[in-house]
């Protein structure tokens, strides 16, 4: 079961002039945006350094490991930086912003892999409470603050760099890439070669119909694993490709579990019952709530989480008993109207899950979650 590390090992000795850009390169660079380049890569698009130099700076930082979002990220940075293919890529324009007052988490970085050929990589959701709250806000807010930032970042890059662009990202980062391509002006859109969305949510149809989506949809490449959850949220008007993960359920969101063959991801014909079940359940649940109810539920849930006085889920999990106790105590202390609203909403989700479980399994007691 080969993965992207095998790809880097096998093809890392070939430059982009020797072997052209492909979907695995897009996957690798999309993941690199999760690395903590703070203080290592300039926010200025003209202040470029090589990925090799950027990696040396990151690894020289004493506390870089605590800022890693996934255990494979440090290995990915090391492998790419040491390779001929990725190590000499020029990186610049690193932005990493978290604004709790508007529930926004946004990060992006630009890679120049060939002269005047750029890949803008948008980071997906990190482990901050703010980042996750923004994801929940997607069900009642459009556009999100991070979507606006993604568009501004791209249009600024076009004005300053005036080259050819590939936009891409994993998870929310993929959604940001598609948003930037769909909602930009015609001139900027003409600079786009491709857009890559790796297991990122789609959009409500009524939103994209008011955009330039259909002017760029033939350049969008969307990939989801067979039991995709996040990537199947909302609608994908563009066609999408189902790829094989060696993990199960939610863990398939991890791109390090995606299997490759030569220069491509391994294709499958369909998603699993698990993915269909969760997709139908979530859609039914969301549609059962008004916009106001969605907003109120999200507000109260994250208000409870904020009482733990932690900024990230990692911090919260360092003292699970204390923080769980804080949340439960705070929940019990809520006024009856708010408490009943939260319980009613949770029960609505359980009801949707029960209905869809029966519909999809045909009365069976289990559903398949792997292929």
Predicted regions and their residues:
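Short glycine-enriched nucleophile-adjacent loop
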Residues: 177-186
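Alpha/beta hydrolase fold serine-hydrolase catalytic domain that processes acyl esters and thioesters
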Residues: 1-24, 28-118, 122-152, 156-164, ...
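Gly/Ala-rich beta-loop-alpha elbow adjacent to hydrolase catalytic centers
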Residues: 168-173, 177
């Amino acid at each position: 079961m080969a993965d992207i590390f095998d790809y880097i090992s096998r093809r890392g000795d070939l430059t982009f002039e020797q072997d052209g850009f492909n979907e695995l390169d897009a996957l690798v660079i999309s993941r690199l945006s999760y690395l903590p380049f703070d203080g290592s890569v300039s926010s200025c698009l003209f202040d470029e350094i090589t990925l090799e130099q950027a990696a040396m700076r990151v690894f020289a930082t004493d506390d870089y490991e605590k800022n890693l979002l996934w255990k494979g990220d440090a290995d990915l940075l090391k492998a790419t930086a040491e390779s001929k293919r990725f190590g000499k890529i020029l990186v610049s324009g690193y932005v990493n912003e978290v604004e709790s007052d508007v529930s926004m988490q946004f990060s992006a970085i630009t890679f120049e892999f060939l002269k005047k050929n750029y890949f803008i990589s948008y980071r997906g959701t990190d482990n901050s409470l703010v980042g996750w709250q923004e994801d929940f806000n997607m069900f009642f807010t459009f556009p999100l603050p991070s979507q606006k930032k993604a568009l501004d970042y791209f249009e600024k890059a076009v004005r300053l760099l005036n080259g050819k662009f590939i936009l891409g990202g994993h998870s929310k980062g993929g959604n940001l890439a598609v948003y930037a391509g769909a909602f930009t002006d015609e001139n900027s859109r003409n600079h786009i070669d491709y857009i890559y969305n790796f297991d990122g949510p789609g959009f409500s149809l009524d939103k994209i119909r008011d955009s330039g989506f259909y002017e760029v949809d033939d350049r969008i490449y969307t990939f989801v694993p067979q039991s995709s959850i996040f990537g199947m949220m909302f609608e994908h008007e563009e066609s999408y490709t189902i790829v094989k993960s060696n993990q199960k359920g939610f863990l398939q969101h991890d791109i390090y579990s995606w299997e490759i063959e030569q220069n491509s991801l391994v294709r499958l014909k369909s998603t699993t019952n698990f993915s269909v079940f969760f997709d139908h359940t979530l859609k039914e649940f969301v549609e059962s709530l008004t916009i106001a109810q969605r907003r109120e539920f999200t507000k109260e849930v994250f208000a409870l989480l904020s009482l733990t006085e932690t900024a990230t889920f990692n911090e919260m999990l360092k003292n699970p008993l204390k923080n769980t106790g804080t949340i439960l105590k705070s929940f019990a202390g809520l006024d009856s109207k708010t408490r009943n609203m939260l319980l009613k909403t949770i029960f609505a989700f359980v009801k949707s899950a029960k209905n869809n479980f029966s519909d999809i399994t045909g009365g069976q007691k289990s559903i398949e979650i792997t292929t």
